[in-house]
């Protein structure tokens, strides 16, 4: 989710039967498709549109429930509708990459109803600034 030019989607494509990327910026999606073609990747699908409008229960029903969701939202974090569809889809794992720890914490709290945090890794991609990328691995809670 929030795939940009498809860097992560194309990178993980060798480990998946199919990878779907959604991004708001149509030009970025065109670049994602070109990047897949240049690299001979044939198991990716990319869609342009507002995440809250694109990622719906109907979308999940049409393309299948994902085993893993990798999300890298903008600073504002994920829209509540996106969180709701993720909770509906129930992937086994979520990898949440964020440049805003505050909105990431808010979204993690929303996902906490079904997911537990397994690992957290901050990455100092912008040395000598207060900015940090944070990567969180979430796993679906067992229904015991």
Language-model segment annotations:
Residues 1-144:
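Rossmann-like S-adenosyl-L-methionine
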């Amino acid at each position: 989710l929030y795939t940009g030019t498809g860097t992560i989607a194309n990178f993980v494509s060798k480990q998946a039967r199919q990878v779907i990327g959604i991004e708001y910026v149509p030009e970025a999606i065109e670049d994602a498709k070109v990047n897949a073609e240049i690299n001979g990747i044939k198991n990716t699908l990319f869609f342009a549109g507002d995440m809250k409008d694109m990622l719906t229960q109907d979308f999940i029903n049409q393309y299948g429930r994902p085993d893993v969701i990798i999300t890298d939202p903008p600073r504002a974090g994920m829209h509540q509708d996106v969180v709701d569809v993720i909770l509906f889809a129930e992937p086994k794992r979520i990898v949440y990459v964020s440049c805003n720890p505050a909105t990431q914490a808010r979204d993690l709290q929303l996902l906490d109803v079904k997911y537990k945090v397994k690992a957290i890794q901050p990455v100092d991609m912008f040395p000598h600034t207060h900015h940090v990328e944070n990567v969180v691995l979430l796993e679906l809670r067992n229904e015991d």
